[in-house]
Amino acid sequence: MTPREPYRTRIEDVPLEQGLREDEGWIDMQVQFLIGEHNAGAKDLVVGRTVLPPGARHERHLHPNCDEFLVVLSGSGEIYTNTGREPSRTGDVIYTPRGNWHGFDNTSDEDVLLFWGWSGAGSLEAAGYAIPAPGDEFEEA
């Protein structure tokens, strides 16, 4: 078996993801898929970067086919969990196993910078993506 070639890029060279729809929970987010199957041939890994301006959010969602980690590099807001919302701030490191609800809401007046990744999938399509059915809301924790 021949190993794949290493991949290298720079954040400023990776375009913002287009086509992420608000009706699917992507609210005013600036998302970059830095490493994945589409550019690095990584079939089981995605690494990304997201900027959430004030008021932006990634609504509660889940991935049935991958685990996710999230590092809050700067800013603060609230994370969504299976049971509600919790405060989050710079330095938080969050692990969400596949099949669990999660998301992030920038409730502050400054940008939030997130570094995140998926293990077990090389693309959004492979990760799977589900949002709650209308009216399926959780109780606040």
Segments and roles (model prediction):
Residues 39-40, 65, 109-110:
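Short strand-connecting beta-turns/loops that link adjacent beta-strands
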Residues 1-44, 59, 129-141:
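A short, N-terminal "cap"/entry segment at the start of jelly-roll beta-barrel domains
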